[in-house]
Amino acid sequence: MTFLRSRLGAAMIGVGAAAAFAADDSADLAAICVKARPAFVFIAGGSGVVIRPDGLMLTNDHVIENRRRFDVRLGDGRSFKAKVVGRDAVGDLAALQLDLPAGETVPHLPLGDSEALRVGDEAIAVGNPFALGVLDQAPTFTVGIISAVHHTQGSYTECIVTDAELNPGNSGGPLINMAGEVVGINGQISTRYGLRSNTGLGFAISARQIAMWLPLLEQAAGGEVKHARLTGVEFESRDRETVASVTVKDVAEGTLAAEAGFRAGDTIVAIDDAPVANGHRCAGLLGIYPEGSRAAFRVRRGGEEVTLEAVLTAPQRCRTGIDLERPRGGDLLPVVEAVEPGSSAEVAGLKPGDVIVAFRGRRLEFPARDARKLFDRALRTTINVDDIVPLTVRRGTTEVELRLLAK
């Protein structure tokens, strides 16, 4: 029985019957907590969960940081050594293996189906908030609902939102459904006023995303796995209250997007049968694929729908060929000092003396040193091979729109 039924019971059939429902609900909840506790893992001041009887466990990448080996303790009190199997720094996920004696198994919670979650479903978060488990040797359980699915929150691009209370120390712990299955790994909270404590919004990496990455994590030999992206295409998003869509604005020749058959003007309808309603959803879906994945894009072209299959590859950093002038004080935006001959910047039409006023459709409205610093960092860290990068430059008294194809 569910908590919702007990609440409805109080309204419809009287206090006595509602009390019976509530008692059943409490028993169900207690049984789930009893089942989940032994599979919980205390690790590095944070949380984790065993998902297989052979001792494979999950936590957040930010919990393990750059360490390779750990002393961990299960919720049943037993302690083990654990070593990192694989890391996904972008997706904030890590897999570790407990060092078990030959033939020994440990309690575990299986992965569930996060795609079956509905807004309003009950959810339970298990964790070690504020390291309280150090005091009483037991994890804590908080109960809430699924507040949203397919949400984008920073690097969590397809996450689950819950109002089950999460606090520092809950990171890496499981979000479980009423069947006692792991539907997510908790990892972020929404904070206010600089206070790192629960505000009613917690974010979990979905079991769907975990299932996509688990085989790669197990094969990583302690290393890091890479995310993929669709290269050679520029999307344009119209996210408004009444109309939302994602269209292809430009496709670069000779790229994987061009080989897949994308055309300017295509509207993205779905990616691998997952509906794309807006730009956030499109970016979220594309953000969870591993390197080398193939994805089916359903696009609307004219009056018909066409399915395109594209290969997604890991980003490769590149040099744009742009050198910036040093800041000289005053209210200066980034100024191009030199353009490398034969570079992507020269092909795009950039010239010495150009003032960068917009990057990827956004005006550089910052104080002078901040604008230059942020733009310089973006040049070095966010532009990859086959990216189409819109730039607006001021040349004399005229603003010029340029498109840089990174090579």
Task: Name each model feature, range by range.
Residues R78, G112-D136, R294:
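Short glycine/Trp-rich loop-beta-loop segment that forms part of the substrate-binding cleft
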Residues E165, L216-A270, A274-R281, E305-A358, ...:
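PDZ/PDZ-like groove recognition
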Residues K35, A89-G91, L135-A138, A148-I160, ...:
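Gly/Ser-enriched beta-turn/beta-hairpin loop segments
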Residues F21-N60, R67-R69, R73, K81-K83, ...:
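N-terminal activation segment of mature serine protease catalytic domains
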Residues F70-A102, P110-E115:
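Conserved catalytic-core segment of clan PA serine endopeptidases
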Residues S47, R67-F70, G103-V106, V126-V143, ...:
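Active-site loop architecture of trypsin-fold serine endopeptidases
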Residues E65, D71, A258, A270-R298, ...:
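PDZ domains, with a preference for the canonical peptide-binding region formed by the helix
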Residues A23-C33, E104, P129-L132, V182-D239, ...:
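C-terminal cap/linker of serine protease catalytic domains
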